[in-house]
Amino acid sequence: MLMLGMNFSATLQLLLPISLTINLLQLSKCHHYVDRAILRGITIFALPAIGLALWASTHWSLSLEVFVAILVLTFSLQDRLGFVRATLDRLLEFQRTYITIMGLVHGASNLGGSMLTALAFGKGLDRHVSRATIVAGYILFATIQLATLYLAGEEWQIDFGVEASLIVSGAITFWLTERYIFTKFDSKKYRKGLEILLIATGILLLLSSF
């Protein structure tokens, strides 16, 4: 969206209601699987960081694509390279620091979701727990972002008709994915899918930084 000439605030105003709707629909089916320890860490450490960084981003912008790309690509290699696994195990011993940095990155660039996915992948969570925790985290992210934009006095720039049609499209996409795709994934396939997602995300972020 930034490439299409929309500023950061307008991009968030377009994407966040859609993301929030889809994730609420997902959470309604899997809320009992949420890893509450991770969610508590997000609430305490990430949300204030998101609010602070997003408020700051309304005054200046910061490019974090390369940082996030390197991080998620590193996480994607943990099942392939033993020394990467050992390094990430040590990194995740400082989970509060990681979550705080994730919040700062998300507030400044909206790229913290990739770091949350990497965290779930790195901890080797069961596919249901991983999915539910990521979804719950996204909901908290979107809620604090929308609240921060409102409190910062950002004028709403997106046509409500366009927003509503995109929300409906997102809900239909979720229903189709839930019905025909997710049910076909066991834990092994889900983890492989996350690995591919992290690799693709990292490559796309690197490409977008040039």
Label every model-predicted segment.
Residues 1-40, 99, 103-107, 111-170:
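Small-residue-rich hydrophobic segments that form or flank transmembrane alpha-helices
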Residues 7-8, 60-61, 126, 186-190:
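A helix-boundary/kink motif common to multi-pass secondary transporters
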Residues 54-62, 86-88, 149-162, 184, ...:
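Membrane-interface helix termini and inter-helical loops of multi-pass transporters
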Residues 25-33, 54, 62, 66-91, ...:
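Transmembrane helix exit motif
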Residues 37, 41, 177-200:
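Interfacial loop-to-transmembrane junctions
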Residues 52-57, 61, 65, 105-112, ...:
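Hydrophobic alpha-helical transmembrane segments in multi-pass integral membrane proteins
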Residues 16, 69-72, 76, 135, ...:
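Residues within membrane-spanning alpha-helices of integral membrane proteins
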